[in-house]
Amino acid sequence: MKVLLIGGGAREHAIAMALKKNRSVELYTLMKNKNPGIYGLSKEVSFNNETDIDKIKEFAEKIRPELAIIGPEAPLGVGAADLLTEMGIPTVGPKKLPAQIETSKEFMRNLFKKYNIKGSLKYAAFNEYGENLEKFIDEMTGLGKDVVVKPAGLTGGKGVKVVGEQLKNNDDAKLYAKEVFEKSIGGGKIIVEEKLVGVEFTLHGFVDGENIVFMPAVQDHPHAYNNDEGPITGGMGSYSCSNHKLPFLPDDKLDEAKEIMKETVNAIKAEVGPYNGFLYGQFMLTKDGPKIIEYNARFGDPEAMNLLPILKTDFLDVCFGISNGNLDNINIEFENKATVCKYVVPNGYPICPVKNKEILVNSNEIEKAGAILFYASVNEENGKLVITGSRSAAVTGISERIEDAEKIAQDAIINFEGEIFFRSDIGTKKLIEKRIERMKELI
């Protein structure tokens, strides 16, 4: 069974590992970097830019895969799924128009407004800096609300700035909005939203165009440093619980979030056509219930490293179910295990990360600790592993109890050497209790 995988990060390493549990899978990967984990699982690799449509087509024509899976968001944004589908290849990953649920924040917010989907918030979209933008922010100030400034396009998870975190106040938000337009960050168009107050969580679904099958809820940790301090990153780590819920998230609020995602899938289909792929909702649990912060048209990273290792059902079957609209005939199950994932990242990340420095990985000790190792933004050069400036590698601990899963991950993550750092508090009792207390305060 020939499977084409596009992408070379830790998320794609997790996808590759899940696929290879089925011994019939022959993996062919197109990635820009030599990720040693994916490379070792692949029969053949094409080293090319993951948004190069011509190279994707060339590689697909050469290997003639029976299934294609697109990992990152960037290839989705340039129509990789459209191309592969037109070639007659069953593809996991939404086409360019449905993928706008991630690639265009304006599309997402307008969709919620048009179809009256719950969980939205006050927002406005702007093509230029001017009086209207300033007026909207001033109105938010008058309502006693802080704002969030989001470049409308893709920024690798690092373009969003929030008042009270990266921005001092709403006047500071105006200055950042001006900078976005001047530097054309994320396409030079922005969304200004009211700032939500609460606790974040993520919810994933397998989507086959009609049906959505939900995965366990996960909590990501986007801040760079312990105790949720420092700049926003692509995610420093995440945890999930053995009951597939989260300790601060009531059952009825989880059900509300699921309903929001179901309505979103239906709205996407009505607006631009069916969505076939992984859908990841980033929510804020507020005193008024769950609100959607944003959607991603692919697996979350790091969340993929929590979810895929505990998937009991054959991932290959799930992927075919997604691509052919047949998920309702598959019994998708996850192990009742807790997971904790932690990332090592370059010093200076995400503002000014070191690059092209060697990282040493003691994989034997990581294995002894009982953790799973995932390689991310690294490149294998002349037998050495070099960091490329983004998150470098991740480890996941899995156990019956979250305390034990956290210990496995922590015992493993100390087995890296180089100009790197990590968060030691992810999955700890202290940090989880902080989330619980935060929700009690709000409610």
UniProtKB/Swiss-Prot annotation:
Protein's UniProt keywords contain Metal-binding: yes
Positions contributing to Mg(2+) 1 binding: Q282, E294
Reaction(s) this enzyme catalyzes, per UniProt: 5-phospho-beta-D-ribosylamine + glycine + ATP = N(1)-(5-phospho-beta-D-ribosyl)glycinamide + ADP + phosphate + H(+)
Binding site for Mn(2+) 1: Q282, E294
Alphabetical list of SUPFAM superfamilies matching this protein: Glutathione synthetase ATP-binding domain-like, PreATP-grasp domain, Rudiment single hybrid motif
Residues binding Mn(2+) 2, per UniProt: E294, N296
Keywords: ATP-binding, Ligase, Magnesium, Manganese, Metal-binding, Nucleotide-binding, Purine biosynthesis
Record's cofactor remark: Binds 2 magnesium or manganese ions per subunit.
InterPro entries on file: ATP-grasp (IPR011761), ATP_grasp_subdomain_1 (IPR013815), PreATP-grasp_dom_sf (IPR016185), PRibGlycinamid_synth_ATP-grasp (IPR020561), PRibGlycinamide_synth (IPR000115), PRibGlycinamide_synth_C-dom (IPR020560), PRibGlycinamide_synth_C_sf (IPR037123), PRibGlycinamide_synth_CS (IPR020559)
EC number: 6.3.4.13
UniProt cofactor(s): Mg(2+); Mn(2+)
Coiled coil residues, start to end: none
UniProt keyword annotation of Heme present: no
Listed pathway(s): Purine metabolism; IMP biosynthesis via de novo pathway; N(1)-(5-phospho-D-ribosyl)glycinamide from 5-phospho-alpha-D-ribose 1-diphosphate: step 2/2
Protein residues bound to Mg(2+) 2: E294, N296
Enzyme superclass (EC): ligase
GO biological process: 'de novo' IMP biosynthetic process; purine nucleobase biosynthetic process
Domain ATP-grasp: 109-324
Family classification: Belongs to the GARS family.
Name by which UniProt lists this protein: Phosphoribosylamine--glycine ligase
Organism: Methanococcus vannielii (strain ATCC 35089 / DSM 1224 / JCM 13029 / OCM 148 / SB)
Gene name in the database record: purD
